[in-house]
Amino acid sequence: MARGSNLPLILITMGDPSGIGPEICVKTLADEDMYQVCRPVIVGDAAVLRRAIELTGAHLTLNPLSNVSDGVFTAGTIDVLDLANVDLALAGVGKVSPAAGKAAYEYVHAGVELTLSNAADAIVTGPINKEAINLAGYHYAGHTEILADLIGVRQYAMMLVDRGLRVVHNSTHVSLRKACDLVKQDRVMTVIKLAHEAARDLGIPEPRIGVAGLNPHAGEGGLFGTEEIEEIIPAISAARDFGIDAIGPVPPDSVFAKARGAQYDVVVAMYHDQGHIPLKTVGFELDGTTGRAKAVRGVNVTLGLPIVRTSVDHGTAFEIAGTGKANHESMREAVLLAVRLVGQRRNGKVIV
């Protein structure tokens, strides 16, 4: 059944064609309920998606488009903005290749341009492979950096969302040594503000922001490092002067337990793994038979952009690409969160 044009048009970039991106796109849009809440269009390659449909055994047809507004937006049919940019012989399944990296970058570029021009309401990105992107000549540390560069923003941050936990990172794809150097008052203050605004957009009117320390025990009064005293505490004080309920610095080994206990609505982490490790520890689902991690549910949101962008919180998983085993839960959650954020923007709220 076709859905009305008042539903948000959501672009879903296919990700690296050699990874699990095509499969999780197909599995997500095989769910008829998606068409009750949005008008989804995949930005990708029709030939790759046909291969994914055959792999999953889904009873779906493809509708290649040259204009996203021409989609039928009907359950059972996948509308795809077909860039036709993949040679299946060059971009093999489960392998790093410059050809696949180039294609993945082009999906993101097209999706950003369309969303910026208001041809779409939001962009949801499938997983890319950083090595493949760089081999193709696009020298970025990750998806977030690509988006920031294409859009031309300098102040942005990554937020992960999963099962009531929300974490915003002071830095992401840099070495740990450099991440320590990026713990500066102005940057931490900016990230606290982005976290505050994001929480409000998620429906939390007066969010409590738990700000993690950088060092063990949040520095223990300067015994284990002075970044808390010199940079983080002044940033928290400045945020509080703006009316933001920022608390900290909280020892990094307890801040997430406190957030799970509802003491904080959002955590500001000082670097990539400080935020990612706890989120992925609770975010992975375990196989009931083997006890091994099999799927992750979390969603990545980019803050500081003029458009809504969400993403899966996992990689290309080359080791299972082409097997039909990929779990699409993170992609499904990313689409639903994008729909929610678009709805709030339409209601007059500022989306970050």
Residue spans of the language-model regions?
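Contiguous, glycine/small-aliphatic-enriched amphipathic segments in soluble metabolic enzymes
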Residues: M1-H143, D186-G210, L214-M270, Q274-N300, ...
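A generic local secondary-structure boundary/capping motif
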Residues: V68-S69, A148, Y156-M159, R200-D201
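Glycine/threonine-rich beta-strand-loop-alpha-helix active-site module
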Residues: L135-A157
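Ligand-binding beta-strand-loop-alpha-helix segment within the catalytic cores
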Residues: L160-L182, D186-T190
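Short, flexible loop segments at boundaries between secondary-structure elements
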Residues: L150-L165, T302-A317
